[in-house]
From Swiss-Prot:
Source superkingdom: Eukaryota
Residues covered by region (Disordered): 337-487
Coiled-coil annotated spans: none
Topology within the bilayer: Peripheral membrane protein
Bias type Basic and acidic residues, positions: 385-399, 454-475
Name of the molecule in the record: Rhoptry apical surface protein 1
Pfam families noted in UniProt: PH_CERLI1 (PF23634)
Phenotype caused by lack of the gene: No defect in tachyzoite growth, intracellular replication and host cell invasion.
Subcellular location: Cytoplasmic vesicle, Secretory vesicle, Rhoptry membrane
Protein keywords: Cytoplasmic vesicle, Membrane
Residue spans crossing the bilayer: none
Length: 487
């Protein structure tokens, strides 16, 4: 006869709890810390030869997937011990998926392999396409962290596809940061400096702490150089451009662009530029992982600019632009005289032609039989009206040239209005890039070159519309009156 006494009940409860706990622990066994994660125990493991490498962080750049036999939407998962990261979902085109995303993975000293898994996104579930198992010591460390190397993804002993990966490990042994925090912009700038040092056969040696603020800006500006696609305002086609951040004069920074990298390196005149101080919003597209949006101000008003990444992660561009503009504003707010020296002390080519600099004299030439000298009151007033009329804002340029009229509080307020951080925070609803694209084009956006027939049709439509300022005219206006703020 079976009797339910308290001892039997406790024994059954303990048995059930142990069984459930064992099942949960087995399923979550990858999340259980390894003893070597303790610094002292890990050092003993290394001295005994149980582990062949130390712990480190590696940045994995996932470029693309090749040789897919299925269509649909795919994403990539990266596993290393207890660390797991995944990319966004991208669609396949002709057996190829272009991802161009970066994930940061922590590799423990107990981890011997790193697994890259390609999955297909279904309606309610996911399907594993194939895995690529990469040896940490044999393929990563001994292979000097390969760049753009193809790895075979296998499933059931058969090759399912190929994935192209790049591995970046930042050596911070000779990097002095001081109180500066590691940010995405600084991390990418250090990676670029490290690749340049490796190309010269040297080790990375950077002293961020002892750099001046201008030197720090120049060091960070390397991140904003590279190819991009910019959406054309006619038809929504994408045009290939090469961008680079450059300092034209003390405190005057521009995002200049050329038709190609060869034009930039060969010294050909730039096609145009965007002033960093005239960018009020940098917004990644939440619905398109490859695009981002910029709100730009010039003398003609507010412009919506759309860009698409080419050879790197979109977030490198959007986060890099955002952080660089903020650091540039902080520098100019600390040194307001630097910003005004580039603005007030700058004279346009048209004004230089109208000045008579003979023997060091700056007396203007005669116009309509009257000398524009300060001694003649009427002529001086007329000259002031002419200068004020030629200015896009109707302000006196000679008054702007005097630094004694600069109000630091007003200067900071103007910069605050145009700050991307403040603009994004003040907006009740952050604009969706898909809605903003609709302001520029009607219908579907296409990513291809225009055919000759379409170019003729668009040219005829452009002639029927009111004539707009061309890119060259726009840039000449900006050259004459450097735009740092928009009221």
């Amino acid at each position: 006869m079976f009797v339910l006494d308290p001892a039997a009940i406790c024994c059954c409860a303990v048995t059930c709890c142990c069984g459930v706990g064992s099942v949960c622990a087995y399923r979550k066994r990858q999340s259980i810390p390894h003893p070597s994660e303790c610094a002292l125990i890990g050092k003993m493991y290394r001295l005994c030869g149980c582990h062949d490498h130390d712990k480190f962080d590696v940045l994995i750049e996932i470029h693309e997937i090749h040789d897919l036999t299925q269509s649909g939407k795919f994403f990539v998962e990266v596993h290393a011990g207890r660390s797991e990261e995944r990319t966004g979902v991208c669609s396949a085109k002709k057996g190829r998926v272009e991802i161009q995303e970066r994930v940061n993975i922590h590799v423990r000293q107990a981890d011997k392999t790193l697994t890259v898994r390609v999955k297909k996104q279904g309606l309610t579930s996911t399907e594993a396409i194939g895995d690529a198992v990469i040896g940490v010591k044999s393929e990563l460390i001994d292979g000097a962290f390969p760049k753009r190397q193809s790895f075979f993804c296998q499933k059931d002993g058969k090759t399912a596809c190929k994935i192209v990966l790049s591995f970046h490990r930042l050596d911070t042994g000779n990097v002095s940061l001081g109180d500066f925090q590691m940010s995405p912009l600084l991390h990418q700038a250090l990676l670029i400096a490290q690749s340049e040092a490796e190309a010269r056969g040297e080790t990375l040696q950077v002293d961020i702490l002892n750099m001046t603020e201008v030197e720090r800006l120049r060091f960070l500006s390397k991140v904003l150089e590279g190819p991009l696609k910019q959406m054309s305002s006619i038809g929504g086609a994408w045009k290939n451009l090469y961008f680079r951040a450059a300092e034209r004069r003390n405190g005057k920074w521009e995002w200049q662009y050329w038709s190609s990298k060869d034009d930039c390196m060969s010294g050909i005149k730039k096609r145009g530029a965007y002033s960093f101080m005239a960018i009020s919003l940098v917004l990644p597209d939440k619905h398109d992982r490859h695009c981002f949006y910029i709100r730009y101000h010039d003398t003609g008003g507010v412009h919506d600019l759309f860009f698409k990444r080419v050879d790197r992660d979109r977030n490198l561009w959007s986060d890099g632009l955002f952080e660089f503009i903020e650091k540039l504003r902080e520098y100019l707010e600390k040194h307001p005289e630097v910003a005004m020296s580039g603005r007030g002390g700058h004279s346009s080519r048209r004004e230089k032609k109208k000045e008579g600099d003979v023997g060091g004299s700056r007396t203007p030439r005669k116009r309509d039989g009257k000398a524009l000298t300060p001694r003649t009151g009427a002529s001086d007033d007329a000259g002031d009206d002419g200068i004020r009329g030629r200015s896009p804002r109707g302000s006196d340029r000679r008054a702007l040239s005097h630094r004694s009229f600069v109000d630091p509080a007003e200067l900071a307020e103007k910069r605050r209005v145009l700050s991307p951080r403040e603009t994004a925070a003040d907006e009740m609803t952050r604009p969706r890039a898909s809605v903003l694209k609709g302001r520029m084009i009607e219908g579907l956006m296409y990513d291809r070159s225009l055919q000759p027939g379409e170019k003729n049709e668009e040219a005829s439509e452009a002639d029927e519309r009111p004539r707009e300022r061309t890119e060259g005219v726009e840039y000449e206006r900006e050259e004459e009156q450097p735009l740092l703020f928009t009221q």
